[in-house]
Amino acid sequence: MAAAYVLINTAPGKAGEARKQIGEIAGVKSAHAVTGAYDIIAYIEGGDVSELGNKVVSQIQSIDGIAQTMTSVVVELP
């Protein structure tokens, strides 16, 4: 299993609806509107890193109002 945080910037006025749509995607465990450099932070899970990448590119980035994403994959440290 792989997991990642997706940091998302939206067009002005689009964060609320985008967050709602992101939250409906299978594998998205949480999606929150936040203050700071990003508008939304989502936590996603999938079978592997490739699946996470496909989810970001084909499902999250295709939502109307999504301007930019940055994905940080969760790693297990000893």
Located regions from the model:
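A compositional/biophysical signature of low hydrophobicity enriched in polar/charged and small residues
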Residues: 1-78
